Design a protein with these regions (language model features):
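Hydrophobic pocket/interface hotspot
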Residues: 32, 44-45, 52, 69, ...
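A short gly/proline-enriched turn/hairpin at secondary-structure junctions
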Residues: 53-64, 81
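Beta-strand elements of well-folded, non-transmembrane domains
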Residues: 37, 110-112, 129
Length: 148
């Protein structure tokens, strides 16, 4: 009988821990998105841990400095059309690999100043928990995915 209660308590504790981790990761993703919307480069950088890896279909970047990451994000953000207003997460799937590493698969939409969606995209974000805070260390943005 005691074993059953112990198992129930352990399962409940694990679910609470899992839920807390998910909330912390979602908070990190939301902080990153908000900084991106505001073009707040200092805050964008605060969401990362170095070195940062950004992999696109065209190139692979390894960024070791805040200056380098700021440069990349000014380019990314600067290439958006003038009518860009905000981005919104559509779906976020989280896999925690161990207690300090997570892989986040997220889809998002970008909207103009009239609330009209003009772009759908996705990304794979790898995060590491440092001093109890989840930070991004790798990003793979893409527009579509094909299952083989």
């Amino acid at each position: 009988m005691i074993k059953k209660y112990l198992v129930l308590i352990l399962c409940f504790s694990f679910q609470q821990l899992e839920s807390a981790e998910k909330s912390e990761i979602l908070l990190a993703m939301d902080k990153y998105n908000e900084a991106f919307i505001l073009a707040d480069y200092d805050q964008i950088i605060e969401n990362f841990i170095f070195p940062v890896s950004i992999i696109t279909s065209d190139r692979m970047l390894s960024i070791d400095t805040k200056f380098g990451l700021r440069f990349v994000y000014k380019k990314i953000r600067g290439d958006l059309p003038e009518f860009y207003s905000y981005s919104k997460w559509n779906n976020i799937d989280i896999q925690v690999m161990d207690k300090n590493i997570a892989i986040v698969s997220a889809s998002f939409s970008r909207y103009d100043k009239n609330e009209k969606k003009f772009y759908d995209g996705s990304g794979i974000y790898q995060l590491k928990k440092i001093d109890k805070v989840w930070k991004i260390f790798s990003l793979i943005p893409f527009q579509s995915i094909e299952t083989l």
